[in-house]
A protein has these predicted regions:
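Charge-dense, intrinsically disordered terminal/linker segments
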Residues: 1-16, 25-27, 65-71, 75, ...
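Active-site neighborhood of HAD-like aspartate-dependent phosphohydrolases
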Residues: 7-57, 147, 157
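Conserved Lys-Pro-Asp/Glu-containing loop-to-beta segment of HAD-superfamily phosphomonoesterases
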Residues: 17, 113-142
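Short hydrophobic segments within beta-strands
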Residues: 21, 84-86, 135
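Short catalytic/ligand-binding loop motif for oxyanion handling, primarily in non-cytosolic enzymes
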Residues: 26-30, 35, 81, 90-94, ...
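Short, acidic loop-to-helix structural element flanking the phosphoryl-transfer center
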Residues: 44-45, 54-83, 91-96
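A short, structured active-site edge motif that brings together acidic residues
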Residues: 82-90, 95, 99, 103-124
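Acidic, Mg2+-coordinating phosphoryl-transfer loop and its flanking beta/alpha structural elements
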Residues: 130-167
Length: 171
């Protein structure tokens, strides 16, 4: 006869893997960008804003946490959790900077960190035909993920995201 702990472990294994975005889910890209650009990111000249960001030493590594985002990390790291974040082709420092941020602020193993082009995110939607979960603030990523057979959580607020995870069986 199985005990409760064994049953909990089996059900934990049956849960999907979780893939979590970084920018505007875990770290505050827009706040960091506004600090170096001097105005809101969407309003700034496209080329000029990226020149300022790429010219700022450790821009990515020093981004602040989004309010409440540590709760998301605490919750998901009890399961098969991954980081799935797009790097910027407009800033050659974005990949290494994001890795620095993650190593400084989280305990994700290198094998569970996936820094990809945005269009590649949806290729992680399933593993061996089993759907994975994506937590992302960008609705286009969620729709592409779901179209590839994954389960999307459109992140707009920490309590909403945690409730969605709970609804899916993540306690």
């Amino acid at each position: 006869m199985r005990n409760l702990k064994d049953l909990l472990e089996v059900s934990k294994e049956d849960l999907p893997s979780i893939y979590c975005d970084m920018d505007m889910v875990l770290c505050d890209f827009l706040k960091g960008a506004e600090k170096v650009i001097g105005m809101p990111f969407p309003l700034a000249n496209k080329q000029g804003r990226w020149e300022k960001i790429s010219g700022t030493k450790d821009f990515w590594a020093n981004l602040e946490w989004m309010p409440g985002a540590k709760k998301i990390v605490q919750n998901i790291t009890r399961y098969d959790a991954h980081i799935l974040s797009a790097y910027s082709t407009k800033d050659p420092n974005s990949q290494s900077g994001k890795m620095k941020w993650l190593s400084k602020n989280t305990n994700f193993k290198r094998g569970n960190i996936h820094l990809v082009l945005r269009a590649q995110k949806a290729s992680f939607a399933q593993t061996d035909g089993k759907p994975n979960v994506l937590i992302d603030d960008y609705i286009k990523n969620i729709k592409e993920w779901e179209n590839k057979g994954g389960i999307g959580i459109h992140h707009t607020a920490v309590p909403k995201t945690l409730n969605e995870l709970k609804r899916l069986g993540f306690k």
